[in-house]
Amino acid sequence: MNGETGRWIGGVALILAPLVWFAGLLLRHLVLKDFTPEQVAWFDEQPFAAPGQLAAYAANPGLVTAAYSVFLLGAILLLPAFLMLAKIVAEKAPALAGWGFLLLALGLFARVYFAGVDLAAFELVDKLGLEQATRLVMDDYVDLSYGLWRIPVTASVGQYAGGLLLAIGAFRAGTFGTGRALLFLWPCTLWMGVLKESEFLSVVTAVALGLALVPLGVRVLTGRRPVDQKSRALSW
């Protein structure tokens, strides 16, 4: 992320990534909108959200495909956004920035794996029908979610630890005050896994991420250094 090109890539990513992430979570939140309250209540009673998500795909494959695709695009765009944030933080807190970004990147890689399993499950609905596809997915849901040698599920933990480290680093470096550090940390606690439901609170976490990253992206693009928050106990 060095030089003029790196600054532009990083700045655009800081602005665009949380917006696309928000759009993906919002669309995923809407995939159950056409079901009756009784149907939604039945989905909620299941141990996992997968049956509801597969039923949503069977009912409206275009919407569900768009929702999951935009969500994946947001996850991919977050990689350069987090890299730019880590680069800024590294000037004053290099260890926290480096480890925070590395762990967050592992979490994003895990999301790509989960997206692949999501796609395979939707393909099963197309080929076998909803009932048989749901049975096959639920019979092996835990193994599908954990992945080979449990590498994906282990990597997904990086999101939580990495978000905490980078938030602390951003606060100590003065890049974020306590307000934006907490706003950044909150979406880093978002669910991980296969065929997960986006609840309203999930959408709100994306708004929090935008409030944390978009102003920083604007400053990066305009060539202004982030305001030093002086690591005060209460600051933006």
Enumerate the predicted regions with their spans.
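Hydrophobic, aromatic-enriched alpha-helical segments typical of multi-pass transmembrane helices
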Residues: 1-236
